[in-house]
C-alpha cells in the first residue's frame, strides 16, 4: 500500500452511480467527479515553522467529503485513489 508523507491523506474514491434515480443510464462524460471517499492511509502530519508537529485529525477508515477539484488522482494496483492534503478535506462523516 502507498504511504503518504506530511499532511497528505490517501482516499479510496467512492464511484458515482451509473444510473439516475429514475433509471436513466448516464454517459461517462455526464457523471460528476466524486467528492466522497474512505481514508485508507494517513501521513505523519505537518510541521510548524518552529518544528512542532501538528497531529492529523482524520484517521484510516474515516469517510470524508472533499471539493471535486482537490487532490491528485492516482491509480495503484488497479484501484483509483485520491491524494489530498488534510486541509482539503471539508468534513468527516460520523
Curated annotation (Swiss-Prot):
GO terms for cellular component: cytoplasm. It is found in: Cytoplasm. GO terms for biological process: chaperone cofactor-dependent protein refolding. It comes from the Bacteria. GO terms for molecular function: ATP binding; metal ion binding; protein folding chaperone; protein-folding chaperone binding; unfolded protein binding. Heptamer of 7 subunits arranged in a ring. Interacts with the chaperonin GroEL. Belongs to the GroES chaperonin family. This is Co-chaperonin GroES. It comes from Lactobacillus acidophilus (strain ATCC 700396 / NCK56 / N2 / NCFM). The gene is groES.
Amino acid at each position: 500500500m502507498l504511504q503518504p508523507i506530511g499532511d497528505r491523506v490517501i482516499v479510496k474514491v467512492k464511484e458515482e452511480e451509473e444510473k439516475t434515480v429514475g433509471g436513466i443510464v448516464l454517459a461517462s462524460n455526464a457523471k460528476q467527479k466524486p467528492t466522497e471517499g474512505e481514508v485508507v492511509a494517513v501521513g505523519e502530519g505537518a510541521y510548524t515553522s518552529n518544528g512542532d508537529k501538528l497531529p492529523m485529525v482524520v484517521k484510516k477508515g474515516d469517510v470524508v467529503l472533499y471539493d471535486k477539484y482537490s487532490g491528485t488522482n492516482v491509480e495503484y494496483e488497479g484501484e483509483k485513489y485520491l491524494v489530498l492534503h488534510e486541509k482539503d478535506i471539508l468534513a468527516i462523516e460520523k
